[in-house]
């Protein structure tokens, strides 16, 4: 029963693998015979339902499960493999043969849908979704046009590029489609014996427009796809860094709903029985540190977990360990607490009474998933009735002036009198995708635009900043319905250009990439564009759609679910060569946020951070004078989303590792498309402030460069940060990868962060008193007082023209700093590079334990001019990071020479 599985044939491997599972979970005697019968039943079903290749994949999936015992990965893989209702009959059979200890998790994941959507070109909805029509529910609808250009009176939505079928999203009152019984929420399965199961939106339009007589096979699904909702899925590891199933009962955040009632959160966190909770009484003496590293917070939909315990600390002495969840501190619940608030409470008292639970696992990384949100057709009809109020009076076209509006979450183009429905649908979508602050901000700018105080360009740019995720961006399709007719063309041009730029940024360069983004006008389809807010320009005189399409390949990369009015209309091509980029206006307001995922040290030697650490600022369009948005509704400042960046930023966090230390989590740092989940500060005893002069005093006569002056860095919205993590070739930790630094967000918008390929490492190992400037007024920095033996050789820079020198800048001077390779890592983080507003790399973090920290000469704010004599002028961000990394790795010399200058000198 426990024989090796890899060498089994396909026909026998399923039985062998399942038999191994049965042996792992069963007892003896009759138990084994019962499980063997279950195995035989499953094996017969596998042979009947799956092809040979699919059985081989199924076997490989089971082998991976046996090796790692990760139920979450098992269900996620089966979600892709078992892609039809018939194949999913294997799930209850499989449950009977897996170990009993894993059956509860298996039931939870298959019942609650906690798995990624399939990555196949066509994916069925969730298990038993509306695409799986039951017997007897399919009906035929026959439609025949009396005239060549007569419309059928309904609109469709969906397509295989969106992972859903083709659905009827609108039926015109009094139209032929309504008379024949077509209803909103019907899924069109076939058109004249042609299946629409796996066709794109454009192909469905061609099929519906290709004949005067249509015989439609439809299934009453009762709902239509309504755009995307952002969900977050976490991967978990045990204290040794091995992948493990998530804790059962952990609530999964859905969309922006991160906060729950605390009583509900407590009742649903049945990770262990109540008796497994324990109280820990900690009294911190003078000079003693708490010695904890924590992770999580309510802004991430998580509790507070202990990810590190310092040897010899009070935490270790009291029995706290990695993998514990902190439930309560001094009577304050930690089940629904923000990360920073938890840090403040832990460091503000010298007597702590903690309630902890031995969960035995840690959240490791987060994946952001955009899932299809479904809208019930009954709700759509109610919305139309409430917004219009007189549906029965609109059976003729001449009663009211026709208007064109966009359907929910798609690029729907429909001739209708129900133009006032647009705002209602926009509000409906915004409630699902935006929090209250963002919702109020969007409403404010729309009101300002309608009042004439804000131009369409300013409105669009403000919305680009506000709708900063893949899911939120789909709201632009509804916003278009509120745009004045004279501004529609400009609105479409701006949105289309942004979409093309974002898609080019998301798709890696390769042969034929240019064809993907070519502007193609589908004059024969009548389909609207597949982009988010890009809609067609409609002439109501002849029902003519002037189509501007970006190709089917474009539709596969976006949120919007295009709708199109299935009318026989003519199309004229419009070239896009006249599109001109709108220059980004200068920021009118800037905000400072705490960068997520930056470890902050909570030591006893806290100083105000130097202002050389920039806050990532975002462009915010302010209203004219005497007009102000409602309180608390300013758009969330932040760096541009991943779509705006030409390339992903680099951030390789540095752990203060010794050559002999073990880092079991390194094997998990290659996860793709995952976000860090938050700052991981080290919590120490309450701070005892020392004077800055004493902190800056360096023993041994080792001079430190003067502190940077307090001039904030006016960085752009696309500021890149880089931390170079380089290990010596002869040292054990060989982590030379780079990882993306999470962009600046507030807690209220974290749930909508889109995935930009970021990977979470293990707490990044920043010690608790280390210099880490996160944001003005929020960061902490302490200056090392240890004496360092390093060389500081001043060297004159070439003369610079002093004319027009901004006030307050020092004369350009440079210093040669020699950094000995005294540790396994260099331990610096840099930002900037060519083609950015910081043309030369600047040090933003120096971590304890690294060679740079041991040197004592480099400091935060230094601008790096040269590395080992190689100039960094003209070097882009990634190239500069690569040069520094290679200089540290080379065995030719045991030091690195950095030519640095102060931040506030002219470069």
Swiss-Prot record:
Pfam families: PDZ (PF00595). Keywords: Cell projection, Cytoplasm, Deafness, Hearing, Non-syndromic deafness, Phosphoprotein, Repeat, Retinitis pigmentosa, Synapse, Usher syndrome. Residues 521-540, 628-642 have a biased composition (Low complexity). InterPro entries: PDZ (IPR001478), PDZ_sf (IPR036034), USH2_Complex_Protein (IPR051844), Whirlin_HN-like_dom1 (IPR047056), Whirlin_HN-like_dom2 (IPR033028). It comes from the Eukaryota. Residues 243-264, 502-540, 565-663, 684-717, 742-815 are annotated as: Disordered. One of its GO terms (biological process) is paranodal junction maintenance. It is found in: Cytoplasm; Cell projection, Stereocilium; Cell projection, Growth cone; Photoreceptor inner segment. The modification Phosphoserine is found at residue 685. One of its GO terms (cellular component) is photoreceptor connecting cilium. Involved in hearing and vision as member of the USH2 complex. Necessary for elongation and maintenance of inner and outer hair cell stereocilia in the organ of Corti in the inner ear. Involved in the maintenance of the hair bundle ankle region, which connects stereocilia in cochlear hair cells of the inner ear. In retina photoreceptors, required for the maintenance of periciliary membrane complex that seems to play a role in regulating intracellular protein transport. This is Whirlin. It comes from Homo sapiens (Human). The gene is WHRN.
């Amino acid at each position: 029963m426990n024989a090796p599985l890899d060498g089994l044939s396909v026909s026998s491997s399923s039985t062998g693998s399942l038999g191994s599972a049965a042996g792992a979970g069963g007892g003896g005697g009759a138990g084994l015979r019962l499980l063997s019968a279950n195995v035989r039943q499953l094996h017969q079903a596998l042979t009947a339902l799956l092809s040979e290749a699919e059985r081989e994949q199924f076997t490989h999936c089971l082998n991976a499960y046996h090796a790692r015992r990760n139920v979450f990965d098992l269900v996620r893989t089966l979600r892709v493999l078992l892609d039809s209702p018939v194949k999913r009959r294997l799930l209850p059979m499989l449950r009977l043969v897996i170990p009993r200890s894993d059956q509860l998790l298996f039931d939870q994941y298959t019942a609650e849908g906690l798995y990624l959507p399939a990555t196949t070109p066509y994916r069925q909805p969730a298990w038993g979704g509306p695409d799986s029509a039951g017997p007897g529910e399919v009906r035929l609808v026959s439609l025949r046009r009396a005239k060549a250009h007569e419309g059928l009176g309904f609109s469709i939505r969906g397509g295989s590029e969106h992972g859903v079928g083709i659905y009827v999203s609108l039926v015109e009152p009094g139209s032929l489609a309504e008379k024949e019984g077509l209803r909103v929420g019907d899924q069109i399965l076939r058109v004249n014996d042609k299946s629409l199961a796996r066709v794109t939106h454009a192909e469905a339009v061609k099929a519906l427009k290709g004949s005067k007589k249509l015989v439609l096979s439809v299934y009453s699904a009762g709902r239509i796809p309504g755009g995307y909702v952002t969900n977050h899925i976490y991967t978990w590891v045990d204290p040794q860094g091995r992948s493990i199933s998530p804790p059962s009962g952990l609530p999964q955040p859905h969309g922006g709903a991160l906060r729950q009632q605390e009583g509900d959160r407590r009742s649903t966190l049945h990770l262990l029985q109540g008796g497994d909770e324990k109280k820990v009484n900690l009294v911190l003496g003078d000079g003693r540190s708490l010695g904890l590293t924590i992770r999580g917070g309510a802004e991430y939909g998580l509790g507070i977990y202990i990810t590190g315990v310092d040897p010899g600390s009070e935490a270790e002495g009291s029995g706290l360990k990695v993998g514990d969840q902190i439930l309560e501190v001094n009577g304050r619940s930690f089940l629904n607490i923000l990360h920073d608030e938890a840090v403040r409470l832990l460091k503000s008292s010298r007597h702590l009474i903690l309630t902890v639970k031995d969960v035995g696992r840690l959240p490791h990384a987060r994946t952001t998933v955009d899932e299809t949100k479904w809208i019930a057709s009954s709700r759509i009809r109610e919305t139309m009735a409430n917004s219009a109020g007189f549906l029965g009076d609109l059976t003729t076209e001449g009663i009211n002036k026709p208007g064109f509006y966009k359907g929910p979450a798609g690029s729907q183009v429909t001739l209708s009198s129900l133009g006032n429905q647009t705002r209602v649908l926009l509000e409906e979508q915004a409630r699902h995708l935006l929090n209250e602050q963002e919702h109020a901000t969007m409403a404010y700018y729309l009101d300002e635009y309608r009042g004439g105080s804000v131009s369409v360009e300013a409105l669009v740019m403000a919305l680009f900043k506000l709708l900063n995720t893949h899911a939120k961006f789909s709201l632009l399709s509804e916003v278009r319905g509120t745009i004045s007719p004279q501004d529609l063309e400009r609105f479409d041009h701006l949105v289309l250009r942004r979409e093309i730029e974002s898609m080019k940024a998301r798709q890696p360069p390769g042969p034929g990439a240019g064809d993907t983004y070519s502007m193609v006008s589908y004059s024969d389809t009548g389909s609207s564009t597949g982009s988010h807010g890009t809609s067609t320009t409609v002439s109501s005189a002849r029902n003519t759609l002037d189509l501007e399409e970006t190709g089917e390949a474009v539709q596969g990369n976006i949120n919007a679910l295009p709708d199109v009015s299935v009318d026989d209309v003519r199309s004229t091509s419009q070239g896009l060569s006249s599109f001109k980029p709108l220059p980004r206006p200068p920021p009118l307001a800037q905000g400072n946020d705490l960068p997520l995922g930056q470890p902050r040290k909570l030591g006893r030697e806290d100083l105000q951070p130097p202002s050389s650490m920039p806050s990532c600022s975002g462009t915010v369009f302010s209203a004219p004078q005497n007009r102000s948005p409602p309180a608390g509704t300013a758009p969330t400042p932040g760096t541009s989303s991943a779509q705006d960046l030409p390339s992903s930023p680099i951030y390789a966090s540095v752990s203060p590792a010794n050559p002999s230390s073990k880092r079991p989590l390194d094997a998990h740092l290659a996860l793709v498309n995952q976000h860090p989940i938050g700052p991981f500060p080290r919590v120490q005893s309450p701070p005892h402030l020392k004077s800055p002069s004493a902190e800056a005093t360096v023993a041994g006569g080792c001079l430190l460069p003067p502190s940077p002056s307090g001039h904030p860095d006016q960085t752009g919205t696309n500021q890149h940060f880089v931390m170079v993590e380089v290990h010596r070739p002869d040292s054990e930790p060989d982590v030379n990868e780079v990882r993306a630094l999470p962009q600046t967000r507030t807690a209220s918008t974290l749930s909508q962060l889109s995935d930009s390929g970021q990977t979470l490492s293990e707490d990044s190992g920043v010690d608790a008193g280390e210099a880490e400037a996160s944001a003005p007024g929020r960061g902490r920095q302490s200056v090392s007082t240890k004496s360092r033996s390093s060389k500081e050789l001043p060297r004159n820079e070439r003369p610079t023209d002093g004319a027009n020198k901004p006030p307050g800048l020092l004369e350009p001077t440079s210093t040669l700093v020699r950094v000995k390779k005294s540790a396994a890592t260099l331990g610096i983080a840099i930002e900037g590079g060519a083609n950015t507003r910081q043309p030369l790399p600047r040090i933003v973090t120096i971590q304890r334990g690294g060679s740079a920290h041991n040197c004592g000469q480099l400091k935060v704010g230094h601008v790096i001019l040269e590395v080992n004599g190689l100039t960094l002028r003209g070097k882009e961000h990634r190239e500069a990071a690569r040069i520094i990394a290679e200089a540290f790795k080379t065995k030719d010399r045991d030091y690195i020479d950095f030519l640095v200058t102060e931040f506030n000198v002219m470069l």
